[in-house]
Regions:
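Beta-alpha junction/loop-to-helix N-cap segments that form part of ligand/metal-binding clefts
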Residues: 25-30, 52-59, 71-142, 210-216, ...
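Extracellular/periplasmic periplasmic-binding protein-like sensory domains
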Residues: 249-320, 380-381
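Extracytoplasmic "Venus flytrap"
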Residues: 34, 38-62, 84-91, 112-113, ...
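Periplasmic-binding protein-like
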Residues: 100-112, 131-134, 176-179, 229-239, ...
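Segments of small-molecule ligand-sensing domains
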Residues: 306-316, 327-379
Length: 401
């Protein structure tokens, strides 16, 4: 017993010495590989107006870890999930990341919103901590860190896919746009969408904007879009602002007008729970549909509903897939949790998740197909044809499920 205690103390001293010398690679890799648990850390808004996103990500990650642990873990190691509240603020996200590093985090699940994700990815660059980003979608939010990969679609893909979806499903030849000009997520989707519309021959007939400071009264923008006579309004915004827009727009547009958005609209029904018909005719691009007949999806939805009393959204599904992808990567890397080792195997993986079949490019972006959900009377269901995969896949040799 004394020999064991002495050995443990010596190991702790050696690990501390490596940290003191600034050898981040060893801290994130070899030392972590001898632990009995794989510590997954996540950052996101658990309080405030965007808490629905953060809580969904937290719950999806925790459910996956629980299932993996019950099945024997990863190479005999158990997974542990620790989520820290960022309140959606990039500076708070960096502080939360620091707390997770102090806790002994081996793998980071990144941030939830794009702004905080960029801050976390930057902070993690020197630590050799692998980042399996769940839902931060801004194109550049994982740039500059070759150990950062993501589960979710990136914004320019979503904008491009949305424009193609309009054309492929013959929804409209003329559209209106309503977006937040001072938000990277919203502005990024807008830019990609309009560029692709120009290529496909879809005309942007009316464009209206708002900022964070003007996100309470959209009457002027609503009236302009109504008067334009468009049959589709592209709204690449978050559910919080979308609920305000849709509430103020209710009854003003023709009944056959669609409001088309991307993953930021997830959770819209919860935001308009006082009258779910406010979300009627909302179309949302997504890789996940809770009503899918896929057995994997059905099992996930059932387990999530039993655990949390709610139907999982795309944010929960992305996080769930992220944890299973970490499992696949650790196994492919021979049990290592080193950021360098995990990043090295990512482009060789194929993961069959609840958000689809996923592969990854060297730039960290995923390849998988997108669908659209149409909301009617508080129920979302698959609509139209699926969009093509996000980018051309690289060659993949390993499969993990």
């Amino acid at each position: 017993m004394k020999k064991r205690v002495f050995a443990m103390l010596m190991a702790a001293v050696m690990a501390f010495s490596l940290v003191a010398c600034g050898n981040k690679t060893d801290n994130g890799g070899d030392a972590a590989d001898t632990a009995e648990t794989i510590k997954l850390g996540g950052v996101g808004p658990l309080t405030g107006g965007y808490a629905n996103y953060g809580l969904s990500v937290q719950h999806g990650a925790e459910l996956a870890a629980k299932e993996i642990n019950a099945a024997g873990g990863v190479n005999g190691k158990q997974m542990e999930v620790n989520f820290q509240d960022s309140q959606g603020d990039p500076e708070s996200a960096v502080a939360a990341y620091g707390k997770l590093m102090d806790w002994g985090m081996n793998v980071c699940l990144g941030g939830v919103l794009s702004g905080e994700t960029a801050s976390v990815v930057t902070a993690a660059k020197a630590d050799d901590v692998f980042i399996m980003e769940t839902t931060g979608s801004a194109d550049k939010c994982i740039d500059g860190n070759d150990k950062a990969f993501r589960i979710c679609f990136y914004d320019s893909y979503q904008g491009t896919a949305a424009a193609d979806y309009l054309k492929d499903n013959a929804l409209a030849n003329e559209v209106g746009v309503f977006y937040q000009s001072d938000n990277d997520y919203s502005a990024g989707l807008y830019s990609a969408f309009t560029a692709e519309c120009e290529k496909t021959g879809v005309t942007i007939k009316e464009t209206q904007t708002f900022t964070a400071a003007t996100a309470t009264d959209f009457s002027t923008q609503v009236n302009a879009l109504v008067n334009s006579g468009v049959k589709v309004v592209f709204i690449p915004i978050y559910a919080e602002e979308a609920s305000t827009f849709l509430t103020q727009a209710k009854g003003k547009f023709a009944e056959d007008v669609y409001f088309f958005g991307a993953d930021g609209l997830d959770g819209i029904l919860g935001k308009v729970s006082q009258d779910v018909t406010i979300a009627d005719n909302v179309l949302m691009m997504t890789p996940f549909a809770a009503d899918s007949a896929d057995p994997k999806v059905q099992a996930f939805v059932k387990a999530y509903e039993e655990a949390y009393g709610a139907t999982p959204d795309q944010f929960a599904a992305d996080a769930y897939d992220a944890v299973y992808t970490v499992k696949a990567a650790v196994e492919a890397a021979g049990g290592s949790t080193s950021g360098t080792d995990l990043a090295a195997v990512m482009t060789s993986l194929t993961v069959e998740g609840v958000t689809g079949t996923m592969t990854w490019n060297a730039d960290g972006n995923t390849n998988k197909a997108a669908s659209a959900i149409l909301y009617k009377n508080g129920v979302g269901a698959l609509f139209g044809q699926n969009a093509a995969e996000s980018t051309e896949s690289t060659e993949n040799t390993d499969t993990a499920e």
